[in-house]
Amino acid sequence: MDDPAEALRAFAPSKEFFIGIDSDGCVFDSMEIKHKECFAPMFIKHHSLQAVSKYAREVWEFVNLYSKTRGCNRFHALLRALELLRERPEAQARSVVVPSYPALEEWVQRESKLGNATLDAEVAGGNVGLAQIKVWSDAVNAAVKDIVHGVPPFPLVAETLTAANAQADCMVISQTPIEALDREWAENKLDGLISLIAGQEMGTKTQHLEMAAREKYAGENILMIGDAPGDH
């Protein structure tokens, strides 16, 4: 399997400054629709949480929209949401068995590129403990592709990127799958305003910045724009 992160390592500066830009919630007002209409329903459906759907939705939205973990990788978010749901007295009172996924816990600890490609490879290689995680993740991707259309960028994004390009190399730094990023940026004709799109398959946001910008630009010339603590 080719390493998608090689594009980041090979990236060569063309300007004095570097600007990393998060996509969901920063360029596009897409966090709410993705998590409320795609992620949360698939969280309930594929982890058998129908009996506590109200509380499952609450914890999913808390983890991914309304707390310090906003914008985190979906696999970390899944573990955190299940942990919080397990602690909810409403779930305990209904004797609902909130699933645990030891294989997922082990995988997120050792895998640096938590994405579709590495998950597919794990399952294909015989990691049956991740099979249900793949079913859920694939369902989320299908829901996003089906539902999330016509979500424009925030006002003045194109103008801002155009101005930034005069002095800086601009790059998407995101934990969204690359396929979705490519589609959304192309749909809104913004893909020509950035040097590269880095998604979850290329590693964490910190790893993106280390490979693409660290030691290639002066530290004071590197800027990351985001909407969550994880973008810091």
Language-model regions: role of each:
Residues 4-60, 76:
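Active-site neighborhood of HAD-like aspartate-dependent phosphohydrolases
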Residues 41, 49-51, 62-105, 214:
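Active-site phosphate-binding/coordination module
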Residues 135-150, 189-201:
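Glycine-rich phosphate-binding "P-loop"
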Residues 39, 139, 157-185, 197-200:
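Substrate-recognition element of Asp-dependent hydrolases with the DxDx(T/V) motif
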Residues 86-140:
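Extended, charge-rich helix/loop segments that form flexible
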Residues 120-134, 141-172, 207:
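Short, acidic loop-to-helix structural element flanking the phosphoryl-transfer center
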Residues 1-21, 58, 67, 87-88, ...:
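Non-catalytic pre-domain segments flanking phosphatase-related domains
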